[in-house]
Amino acid sequence: MIPARPSILFVANAGPEVGGGHVMRCITLARALGERGADCAFVCTPAVAALLEVFGPEIPREEATSLEPDDIADALTGVRFDAAVFDHYGLSRGHHEALAKGRSTLVIDDLADRPLAANVVLDSGPGRQASDYALLTDDKTRLLLGPEFAPVRPEFSHLRGAALSRRGGEVRGVLVALGLTDVGGITGRVVERLRQRLNGVTLDVVLGAGAPSLPGLIKIASRDPRMTLHVDTQEMAQLILESDFAIGAAGSSIWERCVLGLPSAILVLAPNQQGAAAALAEREAALVIDVNADNLDARIDRAIVRLMTDAGLRARLSAASAAICDGLGAGRAAEAFLQVIASRDSLPHPEGPRP
């Protein structure tokens, strides 16, 4: 039987190519589960550990040499757990079954492109339909679809009222947040486009300690008083609150900006971001730019000019984005998964310490 306080193990991918968004949203979900009576731990490679050190230092870990299926299995040898959460595009049904061994399983996904073995699937894409998973999951799989289930840290919903009440004024501050890993050095490229057009506007730039753009941006910030760097910041909610528009990535951070109604141009940096970006564009909730498009600099320039000069556009983007996500999704997802865990008998666990 499942104990009163279930142990839940997270497998979330991270690295220079995939970024840190998988781990970040899993940290948020893990904390929501912890607040509701679960004990959570992460299977941890060095890339995952680097994020946990900064953003989830209290979370226990099970070390793994890599997040390849065999190495995950080795890391789980002797570990006692009651349920698993997978946020890893490289794992599909066979891997989920082999690793979870009959335990309750939640899979966080954005692609709907492979078979999944899951009691619960969480896909926060705004255009996602149940039919997208009809051939990929079991009939009994519970689907948590749409931004209402997006795992967003609670500080964003706490600031929602204050943020929405200050939208609509002049542009005084701009935020650049293109992912902690700064894929391809895109942050430096965008900052250079912005600096040519800021005049008296301030610029807050968020990125990780290992971002390839960081050394160059440190030099620029030292001689440009308009610009402030925020490295591995814990204050993203406050930065979004105080900004008047953003140039951001089209990953899971889009929900943070939606909760606080921040007008944004979003850059599609990876194929898994295309669906959510297209859905936001269709709802006129963001300006969307694909980094693989021709004339990228010109497209960025046009978006900057529109956001700087068109107050009506900013107001429309703010209202449309705020209507998409309220920031309470982590709690909804945690409660749904705990209900599933409580309703199922677990297979006997291998002997070993709980994570």
What does each of the following model-derived ranges do?
Residues 10-20, 25-32, 44-137:
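Active-site and donor-binding regions of nucleotide-sugar-utilizing enzymes
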Residues 20, 234-276:
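A donor-sugar binding/catalytic signature common to diverse glycosyltransferases
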Residues 117-185, 210, 214:
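A nucleotide-sugar donor-handling region in carbohydrate enzymes
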Residues 161-162, 166-244:
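Donor-nucleotide binding loops and adjacent catalytic segments primarily
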Residues 264, 282-294, 306:
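A short acidic/histidine/glycine-rich donor-binding loop in glycosyltransferase catalytic cores
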Residues 295-312:
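C-terminal "capping" alpha-helix adjacent to the active site of nucleotide-linked donor transferases
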Residues 306, 313-327:
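A short, well-ordered alpha-helix in the C-terminal region of glycosyltransferases
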Residues 327-355:
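C-terminal alpha-helical cap of glycosyltransferases
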